[in-house]
Design a protein with these regions (language model features):
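Conserved small/polar residues in nucleotide/adenosyl-binding loops
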Residues: 186-192
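Membrane-interface loops
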Residues: 40-53, 90-182
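N-terminal transmembrane-helix/juxtamembrane module of multi-pass inner/ER membrane proteins
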Residues: 1-81
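Internal transmembrane alpha-helix with an interfacial aromatic "cap," most often the third helix
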Residues: 76-94
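Hydrophobic alpha-helical transmembrane segments
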Residues: 85, 172-173, 188
């Protein structure tokens, strides 16, 4: 299971020199990670039981900053980055498959934790009511888009931190980012803790 690419990659291997490898890899990412996450997120929201509250005093002291949504969205640029830069040559394509297998397994393990120990985020109350109601520019992004798409569940452990850190590490391995850029990208994972 861990020492060679899974069978599902055979089709991808056959098209490894074609541009569509990128899009097909994104499709696998959606089916293997995004879709299960969304289903579990909405299921836990419907159940409505939280095992514990992961919020700390520090979390409660951080004020709402509307533009931080842009930082949050930057996480979603990481996912296609590994699929995009993992097409350079046959060795890197194999590494990309192994990387995504690792990412899938870790994600699935965390999704099991989300089911067994669901955690609700209670800090949304810090967001002004008009923003939560969908009013204004930030209201659209928070109230209408994010909060209806991603319910305040699945807070612990943080998939954002695990996934973004792994992606940065594989990009470093492939020397997509190095030196000061590597430090910058690694620091970009810090805001995903929020």
């Amino acid at each position: 299971m861990f020492d060679s690419p899974w069978r599902m990659w055979r089709r991808h291997w056959d098209i490894r020199h074609q541009p569509r490898l990128f899009l097909e890899t994104l499709g696998v990412l959606f089916l293997a990670m995004a879709l299960p996450y969304a289903i579990i997120n909405h299921l836990m929201n419907a159940v409505g039981w939280s095992a514990f509250d992961p919020v700390t005093r520090i979390d409660e002291q951080i004020p709402f900053i509307g533009w931080s949504f842009i930082v949050y969205l930057s996480l979603y640029l990481y996912y296609p980055a590994a699929a995009w830069f993992g097409r350079k040559n046959d060795v890197i394509v194999r590494e990309m498959f192994a990387f995504h297998q690792t990412l899938f397994i870790l994600t699935w393990m965390i999704l099991i934790i989300f089911i067994v120990l669901p955690t609700e985020i209670h800090i949304r109350d810090h967001i002004p009511l008009e923003v939560r109601s969908g009013e204004g520019f930030w209201g659209y992004w928070y109230g209408d888009f994010m909060h209806k798409t991603d319910n305040p569940w699945n807070a612990w452990p943080s998939l954002h931190v695990v996934q973004s850190l792994l992606i940065v590490l594989i990009l470093r391995r492939w020397q997509v980012i190095s030196g000061y850029k590597a430090v910058s990208y690694t620091h970009l994972t810090l805001p995903t803790i929020a």
